[in-house]
C-alpha cells in the first residue's frame, strides 16, 4: 500500500506546472498561449526572461527529484523509486490540475535522473550542454542527451531497473519533441536565445 501511495504522491507533485504557477504569480500570462505554447522553462525564457525561467527550471527539476528521494527514504527499493520517478515525470507531461496538458519533461526528467544516479545525471547534463553549446538548439540537446541517458545509467549505476526506467523517460521525451525534430530537419527550429516559437 505504501508503494502505491508513493507513486500517487509522485504523480500529484509532478502535475504541478511550475511554468504556469510562476507566470501567474509574476503576472506574466499563460505560457501555453505564447511562444511555443509549451509550459516549460525554455518557453518561459523566450516569453519572460531569465529569472522566471530559472525559477521554472528549479521547480520542474525539484518535482522530479523529491518524489524519488521520498521513495528511496521510505522503501530503499529501486523499483518503487523508479515508479515514483516515472509517476512524477508523467505527471509533468499529463498534469491532472491542467487538463492533462503539460510540458515536454526535460527538466523534470533530469530531476528524476538526479535522484536515481547523480553520476548519470552529470553525464547527461554535460551532453546537453555540449550539444546546446555547439548547435544552439535546446530541443536537439534534449533529444541527444536523453538518448544517451540510458547508456549512462547502465554504465554508472549498473541497475537494470533504473536503466529500463531511464529508457522510458527517453522514449517519452523523444516523442514529446517529435514536432521539434520535424522543424530541425526542415531548418525551422528556434535557437536558444531567439524570440521565435
Curated annotation (Swiss-Prot):
This is Glycerol-3-phosphate acyltransferase. One of its GO terms (cellular component) is plasma membrane. InterPro entries: G3P_acylTferase_PlsY. Probably interacts with PlsX. Belongs to the PlsY family. The keyword Zinc-finger does not apply. Keywords: Cell inner membrane, Cell membrane, Lipid biosynthesis, Lipid metabolism, Membrane, Phospholipid biosynthesis, Phospholipid metabolism, Transferase, Transmembrane, Transmembrane helix. Pfam families: G3P_acyltransf (PF02660). One of its GO terms (biological process) is phospholipid biosynthetic process. Catalyzes the transfer of an acyl group from acyl-phosphate (acyl-PO(4)) to glycerol-3-phosphate (G3P) to form lysophosphatidic acid (LPA). This enzyme utilizes acyl-phosphate as fatty acyl donor, but not acyl-CoA or acyl-ACP. Its EC number is 2.3.1.275. It catalyses: an acyl phosphate + sn-glycerol 3-phosphate = a 1-acyl-sn-glycero-3-phosphate + phosphate. It comes from Halorhodospira halophila (strain DSM 244 / SL1) (Ectothiorhodospira halophila (strain DSM 244 / SL1)). Pathway: Lipid metabolism; phospholipid metabolism. Its main location: membrane. GO terms for molecular function: acyl-phosphate glycerol-3-phosphate acyltransferase activity. The chain crosses the membrane at residues 2-22, 53-73, 78-98, 112-132, 152-174. It is a multi-pass membrane protein. It is found in: Cell inner membrane.
Amino acid at each position: 500500500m505504501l508503494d502505491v501511495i508513493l507513486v500517487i504522491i509522485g504523480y500529484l507533485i509532478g502535475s504541478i506546472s511550475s511554468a504556469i504557477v510562476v507566470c501567474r504569480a509574476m503576472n506574466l500570462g499563460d505560457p501555453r498561449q505564447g511562444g511555443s505554447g509549451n509550459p516549460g522553462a525554455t518557453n518561459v525564457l523566450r516569453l519572460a526572461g531569465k529569472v522566471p525561467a530559472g525559477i521554472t527550471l528549479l521547480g520542474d527539476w525539484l518535482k522530479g527529484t523529491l518524489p524519488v528521494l521520498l521513495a528511496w527514504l521510505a522503501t530503499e527499493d529501486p523499483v518503487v523509486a523508479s515508479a515514483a520517478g516515472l509517476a512524477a515525470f508523467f505527471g509533468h507531461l499529463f498534469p491532472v490540475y491542467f487538463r492533462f496538458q503539460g510540458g515536454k519533461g526535460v527538466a523534470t526528467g533530469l530531476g528524476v535522473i538526479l535522484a536515481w544516479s547523480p553520476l548519470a545525471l552529470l553525464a547527461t547534463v554535460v551532453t546537453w550542454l555540449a550539444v546546446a553549446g555547439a548547435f544552439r538548439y535546446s530541443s536537439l540537446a534534449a533529444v541527444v542527451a536523453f538518448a544517451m541517458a540510458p547508456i549512462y545509467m547502465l554504465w554508472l549505476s549498473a541497475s537494470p531497473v533504473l536503466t529500463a526506467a531511464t529508457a522510458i523517460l527517453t522514449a517519452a521525451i523523444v516523442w514529446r519533441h517529435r514536432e521539434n525534430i520535424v522543424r530541425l530537419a526542415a531548418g525551422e527550429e528556434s535557437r536558444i536565445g531567439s524570440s521565435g516559437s
